[in-house]
Design a protein with these regions (language model features):
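Conserved P-loop NTP-binding catalytic core
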Residues: 1-5, 18-70, 75-76
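P-loop (Walker A) phosphate-binding loop of NTP-binding proteins
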Residues: 8-9
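Conserved lysine of the Walker
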Residues: 13-14
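Electropositive, glycine-dotted interaction segments
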Residues: 69-168
Length: 168
């Protein structure tokens, strides 16, 4: 997609869609300097319930004719869950899933066997994935073998461009 245009009336949420897309891109690519840095998520503040709920984000995209779905559940401090699935057939295959364990204050990552990632590389990525950092951002800063994660990381780094929006 070379260009996209969003139409709508004033105050209908057009800029919020663009802000969410840019936030998602930065969540995938940016590695926080330390574990105490906020994730940057801003909850919906107009009702009491939403203020205290986690934000859920999901994006479907295609790379080399394969469908991927990347999902996050996060709040201002932690990424509570993150999953990446690929559709090489009609059924989804898990490339990884990550959950935050509040008892140990750490993330647990399960890599799918289809990813073909060595145990050493899995440990490296897991060690680099702090609570406010996506698995893909940690992968991008890790010296590990080439896998489908390269395709996804490179897609966000080279194909998904900065969003141009009013005030951005």
């Amino acid at each position: 997609l070379k260009i996209g245009i969003i139409y709508g009336t004033n105050a209908s949420g057009k800029t919020n869609i663009l802000n969410a897309m840019e936030f998602f891109r930065m969540l995938v690519l940016s590695m926080p300097k330390d574990r105490n840095k906020k994730t940057g998520v801003v909850p919906f503040l107009l009702d009491e319930t939403s203020r205290n709920e986690k934000t859920k984000m999901s994006m479907s995209f295609y790379i080399n004719k394969l469908k991927y779905i990347l999902s996050f559940e996060l709040d201002s401090k932690y990424i509570h869950s993150e999953t990446l699935f690929v559709y090489e057939s009609i059924r989804p295959t898990k490339l990884y899933s990550r959950t935050y364990d509040s008892n140990t204050d750490s993330s647990v990552i399960e890599f799918g066997s289809n990813l073909k990632l060595s145990k050493k590389s899995q440990d490296t990525i897991s060690g680099n994935t702090i609570n406010n950092c996506s698995v893909l951002a940690a992968f991008g800063k890790s010296n590990v073998e080439k896998t489908k994660l390269n395709d996804v990381y490179d897609y966000f780094a080279m194909q998904v461009k900065d969003v141009l929006a009013p005030g951005m």
